């Protein structure tokens, strides 16, 4: 089975030498694998803001490389232990995508490690943590995929939304290895089309029977018995079992509940234990022009306004189960995961 580009982050976000980060621009996939060179943390932050990297875990590690570049710059200036400057860089990187919790958690961990190991080079300390984080992220994705695969029955068609990360790809991989015939229906996920460009493409590269639909077709497909299960990811899971994910997740959960279709969240490492309630999760609001244009071309009149919340909150009562490395959990019991 072909392993798609997005199954392993190190294939599309990686260092070139010691002072440059290469990011494969996901906005250009699958038509081209355009390389973007970042030489400082500000360029990394802009790349994240401009959606060149997507997915909470991948964004966090990419931002970690941004902090590494900030440390390298300080070391070239013979001021490699200036924690105030590193903190400013971390704050800039954290501000790029405020809804997901992985980014802020990793930034805090990296700064703490640098403070703790006062005798070492900050860039080397950061890079060592990032290498371990990459390995751990792969292990978590694989374990989550294995847990999720047990929920599938041969003959199922799974509805996906946006790009749910490597765990989703591993779920399909393990199902295929176990002889299960599983199909996918992917929402295109406006306005950046992650479902079309990333999820549908990746699954088709793996040999999965994959069908693309527009976002407004999901309820119809459910009503016709075309979908047996729904799987999405989570940018943040609150301790009350509420989930923040790509906008549109809530409406899929409502439709799935009405149709009696199981709705699962790939929760990877589990909840953010500092976020008690879903209502506490900040919702990123992006530039409305991203809705008014498609690949730079206006799609409506000049007087039309737009609104673009990038995420929504799905309450626990609409979620069948949250899949983590440790198993499948009822949303209201996710605090014990």
What is each of the regions a protein language model found here?
Residues 187-337:
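Conserved phosphate- and dinucleotide-binding cores of soluble alpha/beta proteins
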Residues 35-41, 157-165, 239-244:
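Short, glycine-rich nucleotide/cofactor-binding loops
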Residues 9-10, 17-19, 54-56, 154-156, ...:
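Short coil/turn connectors at secondary-structure junctions
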């Amino acid at each position: 089975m072909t392993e798609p580009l997005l199954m392993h982050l190190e294939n599309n976000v990686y260092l070139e030498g010691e002072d440059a980060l290469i990011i494969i621009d996901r906005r250009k996939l699958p038509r081209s694998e355009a390389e973007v060179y970042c030489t400082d943390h500000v360029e990394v932050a802009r790349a994240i803001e401009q959606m060149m990297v997507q997915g909470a875990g991948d964004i966090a590690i990419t931002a970690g490389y941004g902090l590494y570049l900030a440390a390298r710059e300080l070391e070239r200036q013979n001021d490699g232990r200036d924690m105030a400057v590193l903190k400013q860089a971390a704050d800039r990187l954290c501000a790029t995508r405020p809804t997901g919790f992985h980014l802020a958690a990793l930034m805090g961990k990296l700064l703490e490690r640098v403070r703790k190991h006062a005798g070492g080079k900050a860039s080397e300390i950061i890079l060592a943590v990032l290498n371990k984080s990459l390995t751990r992220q792969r292990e978590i994705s694989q374990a989550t995929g294995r847990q999720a695969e047990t929920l599938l029955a041969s003959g199922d068609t799974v509805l996906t939304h946006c790009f749910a990360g490597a765990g989703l790809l591993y779920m399909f991989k393990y199902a295929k290895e176990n002889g299960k015939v599983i199909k996918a229906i992917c929402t295109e996920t406006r306005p950046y089309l992650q479902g079309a460009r990333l999820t549908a493409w990746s699954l088709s590269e793996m040999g999965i029977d994959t069908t693309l639909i527009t976002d407004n077709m999901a309820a119809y497909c459910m009503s016709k018995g075309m979908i047996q299960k729904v799987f999405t990811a989570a940018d943040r899971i609150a301790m009350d079992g509420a989930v923040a994910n790509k906008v549109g997740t809530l409406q899929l959960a409502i439709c799935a509940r009405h149709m009696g279709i199981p709705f699962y969240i790939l929760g990877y490492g589990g909840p953010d234990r500092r976020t008690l309630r879903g209502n506490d999760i900040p919702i990123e609001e992006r530039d409305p022009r991203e809705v008014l244009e498609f690949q730079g071309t206006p799609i409506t009149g000049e007087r039309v306004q737009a609104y673009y919340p990038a995420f929504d909150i799905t309450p626990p009562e609409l979620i069948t189960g949250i899949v983590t490395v440790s198993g499948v959990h009822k949303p209201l019991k996710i605090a014990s995961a």
